């Protein structure tokens, strides 16, 4: 009987250890995680690319593009950690594309071409139904219309004993934070002031929500801060 139960107990322990997390999320010193006037031509918004200048040079990012080279060191370490042990992603609709309202057709398949960088089931929050979209490289987009809790349950089921990564955008992360559903956040603070855009911290009291800084390290390009839920 014990031999039969051991794999089940082990699976339950692993599931308990899996996390819901935000990783490698770039933020300006004044809290902005995206620029203004995001569009098809400028998906990160005005000055948005500046937020990722710690990430773009890394070996991890180069490998995601199918390229060789790239920097190693602390920035690359955090970038790589963000991609490890991820069994499913959750994205807000804006992270999938610029289309608003009801889907006019199925032509839009995301910002990333035929092979997105996720490689696991990816759940997109939306108010408008759409059939699942299977892409090259293991990514399947599932469109969830019944809220953040439903999306998280689907993602946990798909991830099995691995982590669920919340990819953004700002509004999506804020919803999950307010619901106290995120276990940890890795924020990469860039030494820039944006002045406008989408501010991650507006209306949030992270201390009251139970988060505390458990690790921080600085490089030339970013200060990496790990916030973990304490209660």
Could you say what each language-model-derived stretch is?
Residues 2-231:
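Enzymes that bind and transform nitrogen-containing heteroaromatic metabolites
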């Amino acid at each position: 009987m014990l031999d039969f139960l051991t794999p089940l107990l082990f699976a339950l322990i692993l599931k308990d250890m899996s996390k819901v997390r935000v990783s490698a999320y770039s933020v300006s010193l004044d809290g902005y995680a995206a620029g203004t006037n995001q569009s098809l031509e400028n998906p990160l918004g005005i000055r948005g690319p500046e937020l990722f200048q710690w990430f773009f040079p890394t070996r991890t990012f180069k490998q995601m593009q199918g390229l060789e080279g790239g920097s190693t060191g602390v920035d690359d370490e955090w970038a790589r950690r963000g991609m490890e042990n991820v069994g499913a992603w959750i994205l807000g609709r804006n992270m999938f594309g610029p289309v608003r309202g009801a889907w006019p057709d199925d032509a839009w398949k995301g910002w990333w071409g035929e092979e997105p960088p996720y490689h696991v089931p990816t759940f997109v929050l939306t108010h408008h139904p759409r059939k699942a979209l299977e892409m090259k490289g293991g990514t399947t987009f599932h469109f969830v219309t019944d809220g953040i809790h439903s999306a998280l349950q689907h993602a946990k089921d798909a991830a099995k004993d691995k982590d669920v990564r919340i990819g953004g955008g700002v509004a999506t992360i804020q919803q999950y934070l307010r619901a106290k559903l995120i276990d940890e956040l890795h924020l990469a603070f860039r030494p820039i002031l944006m002045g406008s855009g989408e501010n991650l911290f507006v209306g949030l009291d992270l201390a009251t929500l139970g988060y505390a800084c458990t690790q921080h390290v600085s490089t030339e390009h970013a200060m990496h801060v790990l916030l973990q839920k304490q209660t």
